[in-house]
Amino acid sequence: KWVEINKDRIKAILQALDKVKDLAKDEALSLGDAMRLELNINEMLNISSDEIDISVSNGQWLKTMKETLINPTALQKVDIEPSFNATLRLYQKDGYQWLYQMSKLGFGACLADDMGLGKTVQMIAFLEYCRVNTGGQALLILPASLIGNWQKEIERFAPEMPYQILHKSDLKSSETIQIKENRFLYITTYGMALRLEELKDIKWDYLILDEAQAIKNPGTKQTKAIKQIPAKMRIAMTGTPIENRLSDLWSLFDFLNQGLLGTTKEFTNFTKELTNNAVGYSKLRKMIQPFILRRLKTDKKIISDLPDKLEMNAYTTLSKKQIALYKQLIEQIKEKLTESEGIERKGLILSSIMKFKQICNHPDQYLGREEYKPEHSGKFEQLREICETIREKRERVLIFTQFREMTEPLSDFLKEIFSKEGFVLHGGTTVKKRNEMVKEFNGERYIPYMVLSLKAGGVGLNLTAA
C-alpha cells in the first residue's frame, strides 16, 4: 500500500529531530531543556509553527517528578536538624522538604508564600540542614531594612549558625568590609552587592534573594550584577513573583534557572501571542509551577487557625479648601489635555493623579506649605476620630503613607492626639535606628503610634504590638 507524503514536510520534521538531538549532551537531554521544549518547542528550535506543527509530551519519569514538585506534601521526608530551635507548621515543613528536593535536583527555587506565612523560618531551617550536612557557603541578599529581622531570627532559630553581615551599618566608621572565611552565611544588601566585586570571585553553594522582586527589571545595573554572582543553587523569596508584567517573571527565572523561559526576546514573542491564545497561559503555568511554591493565608487547608483579616473602610469628605483645589486642578487638566497628545498626554494624567492624592491628604502638601491645620483636611479629621478611640483603649496604631514628606506632619498631629510622641520610619532611617524602633515598639513601654512610608515600611517588619 502506498502513501503519498509531503517531501518538504518530512524534511522539516527530520531537521527538527536533528535540532533536538543537538540539544542533548552525553546522549541525554537536560531536564531544563526538556521542560523548555514543552513550553515553546517551535521557538526553541527556531522553526515556524506554520512550517511544522510539533507537540511535546512528557515521559512517565518527568511527569511524576513535576507532579511531586507541584505537590510538596508527597515529597520524601527529611528530618529537621536538632540544632534548629523551632517547631514548624505542617505547610512550613512541606516548604522545607521542597527546598531540599530542589537543591538535590540542582534547580533554582522561588519560595513565594503569602506575607506572614513564615518564609524566613522555612529558609533558616533549610540553611541549617545544609550547614550541618553539606557545609559550604551561602550568600543572602536583601533590602537593608531586613538585616535586623534576619539577625534576630537566625539567633533565635539557628544559634549555632555562624554568619557575617557585609554592610556598612555593621562596621565602625574607619573599618572596611572584609569577608571572613569561617562563616557559613553571609548577609548583604542589594546596594552593597553591586559594589562588592569580590562576591563574584566566590563560588557560592547557595545564593538567596529576599524580596526578590528587586531584580524584576533585567536591564538595571543591580539586576545584572546579582545575576553575575556564581552559585550552585539559587533561591528567590518573594510574596509577589509578578508585580506588574510577565517580564518580571522572566527576569526572576533568568536568575533562578537561566534559559528555562528562553531569551528575553523569545519570551517577549511568546507573551505577545498569549492575548489570542489561552492555551499559552496554561503552558506557561505548567512550566513554572514546579519551581514556585506559593501558599496563601486565605487557604484554610494551609493554615486554619489564623483569624480572617478584617478590613473596615473609613470614608471621609473633603474640606472646603480641598474641594476648591480639586476643582481648580480639574479645570487646569482639561485645558492642558486639549493641547497635548500621545506620551505627553499620558504623562500629564499620571502627574495629575499624584497631585489629586496630595490634595486629598492635605492642601498644604499640594501647595508646599508647612502649616498643616487639621481642619483643612477631611483625612486628618477622620484620623483624629479613629485615633481618639485607640487612645482611650491605650492601644497602638500604624499609619502608612505613600509620601515621605507627610510622615513628620502626621507625627506632629498624632503627638497632639496621644499627648505622647511615637516613631517615624522612612527611607532615611538608619538600619540601626530602625531595629531599635521595632524592638521598642513591640516592647512593654507604651509607644502609641508609628508613622511609616510605604517604601521603607512595606516589607520585613514584625510589628505585632499594634
Predicted regions and their residues:
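Charged, low-complexity intrinsically disordered regions
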Residues: 1-68, 249
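ASCE P-loop NTPase motor core, strongest for the SF2 helicase catalytic module
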Residues: 53-279, 283-466
